[in-house]
Amino acid sequence: MQLPRWWELGDPCAWTGQGRGTRRMSPATTGTFLLTVYTIFSKVHSDRNVYPSAGVLFVHVLEREYFKGEFPPYPKPGEISNDPITFNTNLMGYPDRPGWLRYIQRTPYSDGVLYGSPTAENVGKPTIIEITAYNRRTFETARHNLIINIMSAEDFPLPYQAEFFIKNMNVEEMLASEVLGDFLGAVKNVWQPERLNAINITSALDRGGRVPLPINDLKEGVYVMVGADVPFSSCLREVENPQNQLRCSQEMEPVITCDKKFRTQFYIDWCKISLVDKTKQVSTYQEVIRGEGILPDGGEYKPPSDSLKSRDYYTDFLITLAVPSAVALVLFLILAYIMCCRREGVEKRNMQTPDIQLVHHSAIQKSTKELRDMSKNREIAWPLSTLPVFHPVTGEIIPPLHTDNYDSTNMPLMQTQQNLPHQTQIPQQQTTGKWYP
């Protein structure tokens, strides 16, 4: 018995047939096989080439749907996945993008956008941008290359350029093709040029603006620079008149006749509009006059000798120490004279003090000393409330004033202080008079 091969064991692409010599696929199997091959080869995307013009706004959208099929397990036809995807962009061989190229992605569930205005220095040089997509759910990565071939533009740069500040837009909203097209259409109706191009778009945060509060659907604001081949219209020139300049200095909105053509969709801050006329700018470039490249003859070079003369630092050492020491000594002598030789002294103070004041002061001192001496020899009777249970001098225990069987009911509230053996009798003055029975 011959064992079946591996592709015949339940594979949807299994071969079927009657004989050994020829094997054929069924129509259903053929369709499934072709669909699988197409799905696999459709994941292998080749590098993309874009051809922007120098001095003209370049916008490239990194679509999440384009990269979803790069992450295994590959989705089946008709299956919708909403994995969070972020992008990292850099110039090949460098950690960051070119200076003129910016990138923005608001959330992992929104598309990323590369935008900027190519410079004339990069014309004819292919700029390869590495785009790395990260699936934040499965941690899978996919990498593609974007080849930017910058072409030279006609009439570059455009001679008349105007920069508008739109308050009710974010940069990713303004980069949408339909929104940018509506704005250029409104500018074209006001300016009436033959040729009009968007030159650059910059977020207000990149110009030092503040992050808006998350209330009332406030926007960051965006600066949009456009260029044309005809002079500015009278409506755009209205910003430069003195009345509107005064209103702008007072933080009031200027009066612009063509503002209603923008107001339906774009809120423009006319005080921040900038009009640049390239035809009136004076070139500051100065041609460099190159010389012959021969230096003037300075004679023969004489290097310093190898043997250096020894230098005596003893004098410098003495000067360094002597000068501060002398200054310190002079200051010390002056301070000593002031503190010791200029003191008045007690005798001089007494000579200048009146005699009556000295006598009064001496009397006060004598009285104070006498009171202090008398206070040391005081022996008066202590109050009963402060008498201790023992003798304060000998330390003997004092018997109580009354025995335990003493009738305290007849005791008066105010007792006369009895003289104890250790107390000194205080003489009392006796009044003379008659005693009545």
Swiss-Prot record:
Cytoplasmic compartment ranges equal 339-437
Localization of this protein: Cell membrane, Sarcolemma; Cytoplasm, Cytoskeleton; Cell projection, Dendrite; Golgi apparatus
Modification(s) after translation: N-glycosylated. Ubiquitinated, leading to its degradation by the proteasome.
Extracellular compartment segments? 1-317
Protein name as it appears in the record: Epsilon-sarcoglycan
Q: Which GO terms describe its cellular component?
A: cytoskeleton; dendrite membrane; Golgi apparatus; plasma membrane; sarcoglycan complex; sarcolemma
Q: Which UniProt keywords apply?
A: Cell membrane, Cell projection, Cytoplasm, Cytoskeleton, Glycoprotein, Golgi apparatus, Membrane, Transmembrane, Transmembrane helix, Ubl conjugation
Origin species, per record, is Macaca fascicularis
State what this protein does: Component of the sarcoglycan complex, a subcomplex of the dystrophin-glycoprotein complex which forms a link between the F-actin cytoskeleton and the extracellular matrix.
Statement: the UniProt record of this protein carries the keyword Heme: no
| Transmembrane region(s) | 318-338
Q: How does it sit in the membrane?
A: Single-pass membrane protein
Q: Report residues carrying sugar chains.
A: 200
Give the matching Pfam families: Sarcoglycan_2, Sarcoglycan_2_C
Signal sequence annotation: none
Please report which protein family the annotation says this sequence is part of: Belongs to the sarcoglycan alpha/epsilon family.
